[in-house]
Amino acid sequence: MISVPIEYYLVVAAVLFLIGSIGFLLRRNLLVLLMSIELMLNAVNLTLVAYNRVHPHDHAGQIFTFFVIAIAAAEAAVGLAIVLAFYRIRKTMRSDDADLLRS
């Protein structure tokens, strides 16, 4: 079986994180911002799992990955609830309008 070098995992994780950070910085749609955050968290998960491939007897990478997945699920649930409430009030999904929370 062919083993994939650790550098490939890290390059893919860096590209995912870069795409997520560019999406977070440049886009104004709240749902796209949440998806960009999720993409960055998945890049971190990939890095942690790659760490676990280098150190197979240390399960810290997998344990931290489970914590990050749990935090990402909570962040997605709370974030989507806030976006839905904001959309019901303002009828828009633009993050520029989020500073106008008072009516």
Swiss-Prot record:
It is found in: Cell inner membrane. Pfam families: Oxidored_q2 (PF00420). It is an enzyme of class 7 (translocase). One of its GO terms (biological process) is ATP synthesis coupled electron transport. The gene is nuoK. The keyword Membrane applies. Its EC number is 7.1.1.-. It catalyses: a quinone + NADH + 5 H(+)(in) = a quinol + NAD(+) + 4 H(+)(out). This is NADH-quinone oxidoreductase subunit K. One of its GO terms (molecular function) is NADH:ubiquinone reductase (non-electrogenic) activity. The keyword Cell membrane applies. The chain crosses the membrane at residues 6-26, 30-50, 66-86. GO terms for cellular component: NADH dehydrogenase complex; plasma membrane. NDH-1 is composed of 14 different subunits. Subunits NuoA, H, J, K, L, M, N constitute the membrane sector of the complex. Its main location: membrane. Keywords: Cell inner membrane, Cell membrane, Membrane, NAD, Quinone, Translocase, Transmembrane, Transmembrane helix, Transport, Ubiquinone. Belongs to the complex I subunit 4L family. It is a multi-pass membrane protein. NDH-1 shuttles electrons from NADH, via FMN and iron-sulfur (Fe-S) centers, to quinones in the respiratory chain. The immediate electron acceptor for the enzyme in this species is believed to be ubiquinone. Couples the redox reaction to proton translocation (for every two electrons transferred, four hydrogen ions are translocated across the cytoplasmic membrane), and thus conserves the redox energy in a proton gradient.
